[in-house]
Amino acid sequence: MAQANIGLIGLGTMGAALALNIAEKGFPIAVWNRTTEVTRKFHATAGDLADSVIPTESLADFVAAITPPRAIILMVPAGPAVDAQLEALTPLLDADDLVIDAGNADFHDTNRRSDAGLPFHFLGMGVSGGEEGARHGPAIMGGGDAADWDRVSHVMDAISAKADDGEACAARMGDAGAGHFVKMVHNGIEYADMQMIAEVYGLMRDGMGMDAGAISDVFAGWNEGVLSSYLIEISAKVTAAADKHTGKPMPDVILDRAGQKGTGRWTAIEAQHLSAPIPVIEAAVMARNVSARLDERKAGQDRFGAAPQPCDVDPSALEQALIVGKIMCYAQGFTMISGASERFGWTLDLPEIAKVWRAGCIIRSSMLNDMADALAENPDRNLILAPFFADLIERGVPALRLVVSQGIAAGHALPALASGLMWFDMMRTARGTANMLQAQRDFFGAHGFERLDDVQDTHGPWGSNA
């Protein structure tokens, strides 16, 4: 049997694209899918790359087709399917073989599998970029033992996206579940960025009465400036596209109900465990949840009337608001990553993470070069305090405040933008209102509090009033 350099299990959309990418970069690859017909069809449609792909119809034949010590990538659904696949591989692999879970795994599962004493080596690896990225160059975030990563880093460097400076967007993040954790936060930022774009789209459509073509032109113009990014680029394209069945703009024929695979929710939940404030990301998750309640929303409109009213906001103010919101959601994401690094002992390299995200992934953005520089200069400083971003925020916050206040006054739902503004105002207030919370907590629960002076008494004079 012919020998492959590497193997891949799971020929769904992402797995098939990644396998072709690997083959195209000069690494003969063995593939297996639990449904044999899928494997046969994949090989039959591989075109010029078919000679670099070894299709196999049994797991034993798949393992035998890979040159030892083996490296095997799993691209199967997260959760029990991964555990089942690891169990099936166990009797077939040698102790020095390496299995890489490249699916959207919960990092807790990756930690558990890393600590389970598997009889082979194991890496968790986040892959971002969707089908197009997997095929032509994703961003890759590895997690596990450094020596194991070194074994396959040349493959990952070859297949990953390349930043403008030519650097590969692939790196080991840290031990165990670190790679999947960073990918999870990436997805949380993705939720937030998409939601803010949707909110300004709604203001242009419902508040300013702009048609899809005009909105597309605005997005395209923004993509030439500070907001240059994959998500702004595709926003211009989707608003410009026409439905082939009706001729209407594509956004106008799409049901207003957002799907989600759960990684944004995971981010929001884990942030609570880490005491990491990420309100923009949490608002984005909430917005998707609300979008799913179509019947209740329709009933609410019937009872209270349609919410969005005309709201004439200059597109330049929307641009500035979106710039500030984007900085804030990235800042919150990096703060969460920093907290996880400390909690789990991962020593995550924040500038390296920003560099990995510069190309290939869904949240790639021109801002990430400046973020990498700011984090390299001072990784412990919140991004909003880095001079470059502080200047952008100072210039843009008045516009964000205007957009949020006018939009909310006209009945527009702006959960992510408004959450970003509230977070910013809290972050620039040295003395807020938590002293009132502490007094209340001490009144009903004798929880105590810290004082501003040197008095040692940490309880109030509530006595039996509680």
Name the predicted role of every residue range.
Residues 1-71, 93-96, 123, 130-136:
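NAD(P)+-binding Rossmann beta1-loop-alpha1 motif at the extreme N-terminus of oxidoreductases
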Residues 6, 82-85, 100, 106-216, ...:
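Rossmann-fold dinucleotide-binding core
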Residues 73-88:
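Glycine/threonine-rich flexible loop motifs
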Residues 178-179, 191-408, 413-414:
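C-terminal substrate-binding/catalytic lobe of Rossmann-fold NAD(P)-dependent dehydrogenases
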Residues 394, 402-466:
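C-terminal amphipathic alpha-helical interaction region
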